[in-house]
């Protein structure tokens, strides 16, 4: 053995030495390698002879990584064959114990051939010997590590035993040069551990890891742990990928179902969708919002004093067929729940459209009372086939009302399209209409406090349509018959079948007359030009009804007093100038009213019924005037009483007749309005008792009115 070391020094010059040496030892390597002192190394070297070619290539980088120890690197590879290169390398640090140290290096030599991880430790061990000399005491632990490696390789216990007799001096060696012993202890575990990992072929990995942390012998232990954890890591990665795939599949299924559900709930026909330029601004009177917030429209009003009229208009009540949930959408398509009904469903809801369920009848058709499966009461409006209102008004209601949600506007629940049938389903308002309570036969006198509340509520609903909807919505048929009341006499403006979207780029909308005579603004009767100020005029007529208790047109009044506006105009001027309104106020009230409120309503009505449209106030100003306790603001728009152009009743009548012919092509008018409760066309035709009679056809009133004027 000593001769082989002497001949080995020349070998370090080139890495070619290992192959020849392995060939020389090949006689003992296949089986006899166990007899040689470094039996375990040859055993390890025999399997990887094909690998040495790769390790050198991979092994070359480490030298570059650690420039100081490259020479030892070259010396370390040759040792595997002859075991002598180590003796030459250890002498520099410690000359006396070179021979005993020779045997430990052989143990280090096999690792480089198997996985090339041990060579780095040897490379870095030469530099630390001085520091390691002080660490001579810790030498004993290495021997303790030797038994575990022997136990770790199941087939290698015999090899260590044969190896120990040869290098019997190895125990003393660790005591003297601490540098060499640490390497041998590290090497055996590597040999034992590398016997398993070679299958994983992690040659590149161990090389880099020991090169970075070679000084500590503990670095050799992690590689085996990593080799064992590699399988676990792959298993965990597989589970993670599978779990991710399952979650992704579930998400796709959920999205597909959600999309299908949306498609089912969507409108079946795009023509019923609101225009793209239609938007709604929320205000303090919407569902679930704070009623004390100021009005959000231009020239907004403050509603903090709503309670002065006897009730808070910001309160939310859910009785009487109303759904005022705080979660109701601000500008959603008919809120939540079912929106599309089949004709069969509506037939069941209305009990086959039974006559005893009829709430009223107008020019468009009948209104039936119905009950949904959840017990909610609804009003089903059925359009007459071929009626003048027809599909245009139906589409308008579906497009507009479905987007409008305000506590003073009747909400649309759903709709039905079946062949030629067109039906709308509204929330049911149980307490009839303002017309019913003001002019109904045998009805008790409507209290003044309730009249004020109704005026303010309906004004807020109209102001919302004019100010907070863009483009603004013009009702076009404001009248007492279209103001519904709930059990607490909260006003709900209804009948949007006549509403039109008024584009902000247009100053008016020309269309056929559908409003009720007596509420028509002068400019509307003259030319058919429609603006939001036309609604203001009609609302002024409603205020006059509340003040006086009279109908807008009453053929049983004395000659020249049939028209409410014509009769009230001089009295309004007198009341504003003198403060005496005794001739205007409904005598049935018997002076049970608040004078300030009466005077404020008179001023507001006078401003609303001005002959000149531009000189009328906006609805937002009307609300502020009616709902203010002190200063009512400039409701006059800078105009004093009498400054507006004079109201010519004769010209108004001529304009009305002319426009009626232009709109309908004949001197007749159709039924108008939505009626409920005790009122029907048959009852109205009986009307012969002045204020106690109910009129629903304006044809008779206007024909008689015009005949008496001319």
Swiss-Prot record:
Catalytic center residues: 477 (proton acceptor)
Location(s) in or outside the cell: Cell membrane
GO molecular function: ATP binding; protein kinase binding; protein serine kinase activity; protein serine/threonine kinase activity
Residue ranges occupied by any Protein kinase domain in the UniProt entry: 353-619
Residue numbers carrying Phosphoserine: 510
Pro residues composition-biased segments: 7-21, 29-130, 137-151, 168-188
Residues where ATP binds: 359-367, 381
Summary of subunit composition and partner proteins: Interacts with KIPK1 and KIPK2 (via its cytosolic domain).
Official protein name in the record: Proline-rich receptor-like protein kinase PERK13
The species this protein was found in: Arabidopsis thaliana (Mouse-ear cress)
Gene name for this UniProt entry: PERK13
